[in-house]
């Protein structure tokens, strides 16, 4: 528990985060507090810096300025111990799942334990089997990722992420390229296992309906700045001009896609 908010401890505190590429600003002073044990989603149009933000938090990218604190401890560039501890207590789910096709389901899940712990082979096997059992994947232990459906591959990626028993799991566009039914299923899966394993989930996505149905809090990123932070209910009625524009655009896109799928409308391929 941190001393910042005793009634709602803050798992992750980001202050003034900045990042540029070729002198073009992508993040312009991002401030966020992610409550412990919550599902917190960062929304925004494509190209607004959501994935860059998440990769800065994960230490995949180095921010140009700003502070990131995890469990009250600053992850400063020179504090190797703090960063190592963060890596032990955090997992990252890549947009592509980043599964190894030459490894079985069981071997994929075992990989982070083999790389980051001193556990023996028997204990690693026990933990992996336990994680796969809890995610209802026991029957797939000896299969390879290519033999699984897209949804099962996503579940495998989550099993690998939670096998280290992380306190924070970062999700980078977890439903990219999926149809609405599978998007709903992925967000439902995240919500189910977040409750089961009690980790804090930080998600970046542009899928508004799914995020609002699943998240405890949402933030909206606009041109590298946070335009809104609040509950899904507050987001749905916000008068903030950019929130309204983004919300209406997402709704219009959803209605257009529904018409195309039903055959009531067509789309030109340019």
Per-region residue spans from a language model:
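Catalytic Walker B motif of ABC-type/P-loop ATPase nucleotide-binding domains
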Residues: 169-172
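A short, proline-enriched helix->beta-strand linker immediately N-terminal to the Walker B motif
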Residues: 163-167
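ABC ATPase NBD coupling module
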Residues: 75-91, 121, 235-238
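Helix N-cap at the start of a conserved alpha-helix in ABC-type nucleotide-binding domains
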Residues: 180-182
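Helix-to-loop junction immediately C-terminal to a conserved catalytic motif
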Residues: 58
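Conserved ABC ATPase signature
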Residues: 144-148, 152
């Amino acid at each position: 528990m941190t001393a910042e908010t005793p009634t709602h401890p803050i798992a992750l505190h980001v202050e003034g985060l900045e990042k540029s590429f070729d002198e073009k600003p992508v993040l312009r002073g991002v401030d966020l507090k992610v409550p412990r044990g919550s599902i917190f989603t960062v929304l925004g149009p494509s190209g607004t810096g959501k994935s860059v933000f998440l990769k800065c938090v994960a230490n995949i990218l180095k921010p140009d300025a700003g502070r990131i604190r995890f469990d009250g401890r600053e992850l400063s560039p020179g504090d190797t111990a703090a960063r190592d501890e963060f890596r032990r207590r955090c997992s990252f789910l890549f947009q592509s799942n980043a599964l190894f096709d030459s490894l079985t389901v069981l071997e994929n899940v075992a990989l982070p334990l083999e790389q980051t712990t001193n556990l023996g082979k028997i204990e690693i096997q026990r933990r992996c089997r336990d994680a796969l059992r809890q995610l209802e994947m026991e029957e797939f232990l000896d299969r390879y990722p290519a033999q699984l459906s897209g949804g099962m591959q996503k579940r495998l990626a989550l099993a690998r992420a939670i096998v280290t028993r992380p306190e924070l799991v970062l999700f980078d566009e977890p439903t990219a390229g999926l149809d609405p039914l599978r998007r709903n299923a992925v967000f439902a899966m995240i919500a189910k296992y977040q409750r089961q394993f009690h980790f804090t989930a930080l998600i970046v996505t542009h899928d508004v309906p799914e995020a609002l149905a699943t998240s405890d809090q949402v933030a909206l990123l606009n041109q590298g700045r946070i335009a809104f932070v609040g509950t899904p209910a507050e987001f749905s009625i916000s008068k903030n001009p950019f929130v309204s524009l983004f919300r209406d655009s997402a709704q219009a896109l959803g209605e257009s896609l529904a018409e195309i799928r039903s055959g009531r409308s067509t789309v030109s391929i340019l």
